Amino acid sequence: MQHTFTLAAWNFRLARRSLLALWGVFAAQQAAVILWRAAQPGAAGLGLASHYYATMQIFAWLGFYLLTALAAGAATHNSRRARSGYTWATLPGTPGQKLAAKAVTIAAAELVFAAWQLVWYIVEFYPVTALEGWHRRQLYGAVLPAANLYEQVVANNLFARLLPRRPAQLVILLGILALSAAMLAALDTVRGWRKLPVFAGGLFCAWVCFGIVGIEQHLEWLLDEPRYAFRIAAAAVLAVLTVWWAVRSIRRGEAA
């Protein structure tokens, strides 16, 4: 286990520059579109959560979430290890440890990106509030009370899903994190035509995860509706087979 985390830390170190650049682009585009909307005359009093929703930043976040995982996985490729003289074949550890280290790297990058979004959202709150206060002063001749930061975080459509409020929600989020990291690590590991079935399996697992998030507040439906339990079981079996196939690719020297 210690070797796996050591290798994951090395992977993260190789990926840090590309990840920082990617997160910088994400922060810049989000600040640009949200501040632009907050500067419009009709935006007075709407609040940061409303601007976040109207500019579809939840979809931008999902896109950059995927790019974060791909960038973290790309750091493990042989081309990035050339300077140290290591390749997938010569790295110490078993094939399972190598794939697990890649999955841990991806999961860590995804967690840091989620935390970065929360921090950046807090940073954006203050200039957006100032702009809206200026608009209200122009319209009404006085600054009306604005929603505080806590209210804007609670009202945000992304944080309503990412910040767990119940134990079941925390378990679901951790399960989705582990599943996404494992599937994306496998997708990044296999080469050639093997990527197609892994990609298709990843799409199915993503569809199942979105469905689980949608019924998270009504988990009793899993017992009342057998189709939900069947989909979850199918996704779990598919994930296990995909991980096995990726480990087999590393063992046979077919990894990227």
Question: How should these model regions be labeled?
Answer:
Residues 1-85, 95-256:
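Hydrophobic alpha-helical transmembrane segments of membrane proteins
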Residues 90-94:
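Short helix-to-coil transition segments within interhelical loops
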